[in-house]
A protein has these predicted regions:
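A structural boundary/capping signal
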Residues: 1-169
Length: 169
């Protein structure tokens, strides 16, 4: 992934999709956007080789080097395309998930978009992608989780009270 993202993906200049509604609306919008944008980073990941874990590490490292996590403004739910996320340089869990899931699709890696809740309530409060490796093992790609020193954690998921998985590819 040594390519310049500006050479391979161009944000269309339009406003990011905004959904304001019920929790299911956000889940539906995330999945609809995935199907719309899933091929967008194809040129960005072209030529990547190695095991599924090596490819996942490369995608994860690229994202965390070029984008910072930023919570959406209160009351708004933004879902950014991979190109828009890279252009803006920041996004929340929905946009980070979108970027990684689209890269996994382009690499032919089976994956899950996982919606979770940490407090036991009825609303999903976080989303992250999970890759499935050659042995069927899950590789968690939550680019929002950090250790106590602020280092983003690869292949780590905080225990959740509730989850809903959407298996893709």
């Amino acid at each position: 992934m040594g390519r310049d993202s500006a050479d391979v993906m161009i944000a269309d200049g339009k406003n990011t999709l905004i959904t304001v509604g019920l929790n299911d609306d956000v889940v539906d919008a995330e999945l609809a956007c995935y199907h719309k944008w899933k091929d967008q980073p194809r040129n960005l990941v072209a030529g990547m080789h190695g095991s599924i874990d090596q490819k996942c590490e490369a995608v994860f490292a690229y994202l965390t080097e070029h984008v910072v996590y930023k919570l959406d403004d209160a009351g708004n739910q933004y879902i950014k395309s991979p190109a828009r996320l890279l252009q803006d340089g920041c996004g929340d869990c929905k946009s980070l998930t979108m970027f990684i899931a689209c890269c996994l699709h382009c690499l032919g890696i089976e994956h899950i978009i996982r919606f979770v809740n940490y407090d036991g309530g009825t609303q999903y409060t976080h989303v992250y992608p999970v890759a499935i490796d050659e042995m069927g093992r899950e590789i968690v790609l939550d680019a929002c989780e950090k250790d106590t020193d602020g280092v983003i954690l690869y292949d780590y998921a905080r225990p959740s009270k509730r989850q809903k998985d959407f298996r893709l590819l």
